Amino acid sequence: MTHKKRSVTPVQLIALGFFIMMLLGTGLLLLPVSQRNPGNLSVVDAAFTAVSAVSTTGLTVVDTASTFSTFGYVVLCILIQIGGLGITSIGAGLIAFTGRKLRMRDQVLVQEALNYPTMKDVQVLIRSVLITTITVESSAAFVGWFLFCRQFDVLPALGIAIFHSVSTFNHAGFDILGGLLSYRNDVGLQLLTIAENILGGFGFFVILDILRNRRFHKFSLHTKVVLTTSGFLDLTSSLLLKAIEGDSLSWVNAFFMGITSRTSGLTIANVGDFSDASQLLICVLMYIGASPG
């Protein structure tokens, strides 16, 4: 009796890759070097944090700023980046940058990972995605570095800026500042965070479409829908939050909350102090979320 050899599908390989990264992330976060007070982090809490980082969910059961060391921050930052780009995309991108051609199986994996509708120009796409990510995140980190240098020394400010940039662009919602409430009057940091949230919310396909075509009438239907819908939601939600909360929120605060509620989940104000109407609006925005792709 012969047994057919079952081949692993691209979707299964992608899921397996993420599962392995979650296990690896859990192990790394449990290392004493990853924690400020070694031994205080349970296996469950480490696993929860690793899964949240790789899936860019941003939910936490421990305070990120006070629980993890600098090495732990680096681990989380890498997990977030892998979660945002996808382990398949990163691997394929490294191959593409070496000048080698992707095998058909690799191209199928990338297509599935990025939800790309066609096999055409997959190698060009993945290179563009990586370049776009590096450009946006490094630019935001550079600006953030100057902003954080007002409060921290040069090297710590650089580390915080890089983490904040990666977490924000990938909509992970992690922060190592112990919350952003103390920055509610920092217009520069809020505008930088808003800009990264908007770009991350558009998705790679929209950003690349804008860079290539540059005129609205040349954009794909997907890009037009994303730009129109995002603009409407961001403007409407910001105006409603400002109207409901009044003087307790500045215009920049309202714009920040209106955008991040739908994307990264970062907050510049205590949502628990908001009125029921504002909390309901934020729930609706979280349900809608960012655009696909």
Feature-to-residue mapping (PLM):
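Membrane-proximal intracellular helices of multi-pass ion channels
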Residues: M1-G293
